[in-house]
A protein has these predicted regions:
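Toprim catalytic domain recognition across nucleic-acid enzymes
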Residues: 1-395
Length: 395
């Protein structure tokens, strides 16, 4: 029985071992996604023919041969052509493109030219509004003409700016003049719009997304996270780690109540799900999105003797799993436009209507920290504004 790691590389390694040993006997394959006693017994009860995995073996073999040929030949070529002082320039299918991404990013950072600018803000009813200074039609036409001329001259066109048409304050004197222009003038609300939205639960983890999350939250390296999740797998509390899908197969759904029941440390969140039919979303359960293994989830075994680092990673996995059975988070986005002396101002706020799955994480925000940083906006609950209202403001 081939009991190798249930994956492409595990299949390849075991085939090589059997070939070297000269094995000629019939072979069955044990294929499991967790090391719990229940999963192992089920796997042995459903042993599969080795021939079912012939394409997987051939895929692994092709990968190994391709990496060997590329590494052997390209490393020699680049070492002889560009190596200095007996330096070896290693070339690889994955490492070289990854290095290129890092180099390109570093060049972008080095070539970035910061530009100083100012923002005009005002506070009305304890809410901060930011000025929206728009470019004139003549300025927009002139920019478009310059862009066309640059393209005609063979220059690389500029990236489309997210705030195209907005005129930033790049001159301090202009900013002070605008501030003086609105001095002592009242603020008038010109428009109020409210839009309700829904946010689905976060997807389950594959290996890459887990590594990214652990790096953001705990500053763990990709290798550290891999070692931790491998340890959790060997301790039978998490499923197979080296996966590239965020979905579960349909046959996992009947097992989910038992897995949730086993998460005793999270009873506060699993209790509302007990005794009810669990949600079965296509964003979670989809056979067409599952190949060798499903997403990383808890096995239902109670975790014991975990290190602090292991407990942190397990907590991420457990909470993600519980959250997919909770309803969507419902929120409302409110945008308020105002005006002071013909200068337009804007404020945006979001409010949680029904937290849904977000109660699992204890985070009322409907926007990730990364989104906040990218958009440069803070989420805040706005007071009730009425179109046409007017009043004093500061400064």
């Amino acid at each position: 029985i081939n009991c190798g790691d249930a994956g492409q590389e595990g299949e390849l390694i075991q085939r090589w071992v059997m070939q070297k040993a000269g094995a000629r006997c019939p072979v069955k394959r044990l294929w499991i996604s967790s090391l719990t006693e229940e999963a192992i017994r089920e796997g042995f009860a459903k042993l599969r023919d080795a021939s079912d995995f012939q394409p997987l073996y051939e895929a692994g073999l092709s990968r190994a041969i391709g990496d060997w040929l590329l590494g052997m030949n390209a490393t020699r070529l680049y070492t002889m052509k560009y190596g200095q002082n007996r330096q070896v320039l290693s070339i690889g299918r994955v490492q070289t493109p990854t290095l290129a991404l890092i180099v390109n990013r570093q060049l972008e950072i080095q070539n970035f030219v910061p530009k100083q600018y100012w923002e005009l803000k005002t506070v009305y009813r304890d809410t901060t509004f930011s000025a929206i200074l728009r470019k004139s039609e003549e300025e927009l036409v002139l920019e478009a003409e310059k862009q066309k001329e640059a393209i005609a001259a063979g220059k690389k066109p500029k990236k489309e700016e997210e705030n195209r048409g907005i005129d930033p304050i790049t001159d301090r004197e202009r900013g002070l003049a605008l501030l003086d222009q609105i001095k002592n003038s009242p603020f008038t609300v010109t428009d109020v719009t409210k839009k309700e939205g829904r946010e689905a639960p976060l997807r389950l983890f594959d290996l890459t997304s887990l590594q990214v999350e652990c790096n953001k939250k705990f500053a763990y390296s990709a290798d550290e996270t891999l070692k931790i999740i491998q340890s959790l797998y060997e301790k039978k509390v998490a499923t197979y780690p080296r996966v590239d899908t965020t979905y579960l197969s349909d046959d996992i759904y009947p097992k989910c109540p038992g897995i949730l029941k086993g998460l005793r440390d999270y009873e506060t969140f699993t209790a509302p799900l007990t005794g009810t039919a669990l949600l079965k979303s296509k964003k979670v359960f989809d056979n067409s999105k599952v190949t060798d293994h499903h997403a990383i989830i808890p096995t239902g075994q109670h975790p014991q003797n975990l290190t602090d680092m292991e407990r942190r990673v397990f907590d991420l996995i457990a909470r993600r799993f519980i959250a997919v059975f909770y309803p969507d988070c419902k929120f409302a986005t409110t945008t308020v436009l105002g005006e002071v002396e013909s200068i337009e101002f804007k404020a945006t706020g979001k409010q949680i209507l029904e937290p849904g799955w977000r109660v699992i994480f204890g985070t009322p925000s409907v926007q990730s920290q990364e989104e906040k940083e990218e958009k440069g906006e803070e989420e805040n609950v706005l007071p009730a504004f009425v179109k046409g209202e007017s009043g004093p403001r500061v400064p």
